[in-house]
Amino acid sequence: MEPFVVKENIIASASSPMKKRRIDHTESADGSAINASNSSSIGLNNSIGGNDTVMSMAEFGNDNSNNQEIDEDLHSRQLAVYGRETMRKLFASNVLISGMQGLGVEIAKNIILAGVKSVTLHDENVVELWDLSSNFVFTEEDIGKNRALASVHKLQELNNAVAVSTLTGKLTKEQLSDFQVVVFVDISFEKATEIDDYCHSHQPPIAFIKADVRGLFGSLFCDFGPHFTVLDVDGEEPHSGIIASVSNENPGFVSCVDDERLEFEDGNLVVFSEVEGMTELNDGKPRKIKNVKPFSFTLEEDTSSYGQYMKGGIVTQVKQPKVLNFKPLREALKDPGDFLLSDFSKFDRPPLLHLAFQALDRFSSQAGRFPFAGSEEDAQKLVEIAVDINEGLGDARLEDVNSKLLRHLAFGSRAVLNPMAAMFGGIVGQEVVKACSGKFHPIFQFFYFDSVESLPKEPLDASEFRPQNSRYDAQISVFGSTLQKKLEDARVFVVGAGALGCEFLKNLALMGVSCGTQGKLTVTDDDVIEKSNLSRQFLFRDWNIGQAKSTVAATAAAGINSRLNIDALQNRVGPETENVFDDSFWENLTVVVNALDNVTARLYVDSRCVYFQKPLLESGTLGAKCNTQMVIPHLTENYGASRDPPEKQAPMCTVHSFPHNIDHCLTWARSEFEGLLEKTPAEVNAYLSDPVEYMKAMRTAGDAQARDTLGRVVECLEKEKCNSFQDCITWARLRFEDYFANRVKQLCYTFPEDAATSTGAPFWSAPKRFPRPLQFSSTDLSHINFVMAASILRAETFGIPTPEWAKTRAGLAEAVERVIVPDFEPKKDATIVTDEKATTLSTASVDDAAVIDELNAKLVRCRMSLQPEFRMKAIQFEKDDDTNYHMDMIAGLANMRARNYSVPEVDKLKAKFIAGRIIPAIATSTAMATGFVCLEMYKVLDGSHKVEDYRNTFANLALPLFSMAEPVPPKVVKHQDQSWTVWDRWVMRGNPTLRELLDWLKEKGLNAYSISCGSSLLYNSMFSRHKERMNRRVVDLARDVAGVELPAYRRHVDVVVACEDDNDADVDIPLVSVYFA
């Protein structure tokens, strides 16, 4: 999945938990009106009309069981966000979506991918050419077909575990009762209030959602009933702290270790556990806290009569459910309450849009259509209606009805734009999940959004909006034909074809980007499709597993729009592929869209975009959160200008000897797995393939690490070599004894429970936890499971087949009983690292060279006893295959270690999330992020927008929170009468000498004292011998001194120059490109 790096400068809300569609009226080809008002034609009748068609995909063999098991391989990334209980609730939920234009199909896509029980698609109208601007399942061949029927097959392909069916006639109240959630797109307020009244009063209430996209404007209303319980208001894990002390006073004061800052807030409820001395706190009762500081808080409780605190204790936040009392739409229209704000520069916008959408609804009711694009008469009529409604609001009347904004709404009101549909499709899809499960806080109750900044800056003539009998007519009706041509001729580079990449390709295809004769879209991704991708990367199907992501995604995108000129590559973007993505490639691009999943690649692409001065549209997701950053040449800072602080890493001694949470245990477990099963076998093979060169490298290194590596190789080929499966069981059983008994006994011997530090303080003070050795038992399932996984994997490294009996508890227990386990004798001179700053566990002072020679002699003897062709199999950790025993072993290692230290254990799925470093991901936040980005794409390709028109966004669908802000401008460096930013690059032509380059800089008032190329120094004023280079060409110095190999297409060399002004003050200057041809 695509993780983001949160940029602190775009977060405007202090409440942020992180630092850093439809067509109600269409036109024919000649522009005449075709009445399709309220295209879903919703009416609450007591019976179904004779024209109703009901079609279920169950007819095609879909058997959706009520007791469906969660497919953890498919939904692992989503499970990391929602958890099993939420997923089970989704699997039991039936959802209706009425209105299958662009917004409706986006909502359906997202909730089908999420995995509800069933989705029913409702629409009474037919596909028109106009719909192809925003609906990715429609093609030209679908024109004239019922929208729901034209959608069902492709939507069913997204998830065969969801029953997708259709309704094509008028809905009845009885039919609404079949659903837990109903979503209505493109419906009048009159009909919406009638439906919502029924849903609100139904027992149990039916969650009602009304959503609309009108050009660059969108609205959303939620009513989940009179009493809706939110079980998890923010989606975050309960925070906890390790107690250092508790006072006996009124009120009690609690301090925690300074290992990690507390994430509590005043008024939180917490529970205590494992407290020694003041045991009254261990009663499990939630307690309210106040005066929260980074490492302390006060209890709202008198602890003066409690026992005296001795040591230990964990304090954990208790998450409280929240009950929301939703108002029905009829009441909420008159008294909307507080609006959810999206853009803090538009603080007064939501009340105006609340009025505007009501005015638009009245216009549609009176005229039987929505306003025509470019019609000043219709726009003025809309303004008059808004003024009339506003006059009747009494005390709630707005001081100003923004006629300019209403004009924009009128002009685009008939269009469903794909970026708006994608964005709102993600938001509404998440509201459906909330309604089904109580997971995350719903929108309460209205949400309005607009992106009028995306419109072209120059006024457009009415002829710009005229339909062209094109699939882009809806988009043209908002932006005009001139910008549409720019979209079609754009040359775009999409880096990544995962979840974000799939959404981007879909969006760009529908927008017509790179679909013209001059346009081209290049997508690259070096990854292949896995099963876990299918729950978010919606362009892929199960029959694509194992195929290249970029190729499959490109083919699917071309299927959405056959005019898309797309080229799919399987290359990683980095310094090693600059022969593929060369100067000519970058220079010919219009814009770059990142869809990456790692910071290193993001920074490289950012550096290329800065170098070639190309716009970069950056985005990322993490669970329900997303952010976007616009990197625009000369207008904004670049992506690399700001960095998040590095994640805190646990000290090595903590992970290896003093773990105090399950993350430490899993970090250690994965390290041991890779050392035992991947690195050591690989080292064995390296030695056996070329013993002379291998030992030469070891002697050259000659350090403790080389010594330890050789020791493991000798151990693997000598006393721990396995020749039968029983040997593998013996190895696994002895590993258990070593890890979970002997090492702990040695640690307790070296540092007994009453040990003290050199200052006299208790050694085993928080956060350290005193461990207990485990006694192996063949009746303990977790013990046997560990031995099973370890022995099977050990056998795999030696090429030994696994007998079937070894996969049974009884058979394995019998074999384990035959293993002789030596008695443990503690070492009096054992050294255990306790320094948190230590980077290695090797502390003994020995003659490494002598030990390496001794180990080499042993290896020579081992090699003589082996068959010449003998090699081990190095096992690479693969988290997403539940049949390979990898996670069984890692979870077993971690949980047994957790048991040693009385740390709560976790199941295999949770272990997979942590040890596999799985990035939580859901389709809704991904879709929303790409919608935000593509709204910025209009601005980029228009080419005339200022920095204040662009928006960086941070959003968290769990809260929900939307925080949009103007990007930060680039840092400006000034020198004399000149100024420059990171976007500038100085160019010197004429194949200059070093002297000529220095004189050229001198003319700018700069004294260069150092010139480097790559990692080599071409010139330094302090080195007298460098003055001998004055008459040499800079390019020749680059070749001869820096060893630069210039490809045939390259006509310049880049040098970094360090300069001072005449006052000896350093001046940072841009990169200098010296052209030699």
UniProtKB/Swiss-Prot annotation:
It is an enzyme of class 6 (ligase). One of its GO terms (cellular component) is nucleus. Pathway: Protein modification; protein ubiquitination. ATP binds at A499, D525, R536, K549, D597, N598. Disruption phenotype: No visible phenotype and no changes in disease susceptibility. It catalyses: ATP + ubiquitin + [E1 ubiquitin-activating enzyme]-L-cysteine = AMP + diphosphate + S-ubiquitinyl-[E1 ubiquitin-activating enzyme]-L-cysteine. GO terms for biological process: protein ubiquitination. Both UBA1 and UBA2 are able to activate ubiquitin and transfer it to the E2s with equal efficiency. Belongs to the ubiquitin-activating E1 family. NCBIfam families: Ube1. Activates ubiquitin by first adenylating its C-terminal glycine residue with ATP, and thereafter linking this residue to the side chain of a cysteine residue in E1, yielding a ubiquitin-E1 thioester and free AMP. PANTHER family: SUMO-ACTIVATING ENZYME SUBUNIT 1 (PTHR10953:SF162), UBIQUITIN-ACTIVATING ENZYME E1 (PTHR10953). This is Ubiquitin-activating enzyme E1 2. It comes from Arabidopsis thaliana. The lineage of its organism: Eukaryota, Viridiplantae, Streptophyta, Embryophyta, Tracheophyta. The gene is UBA2.
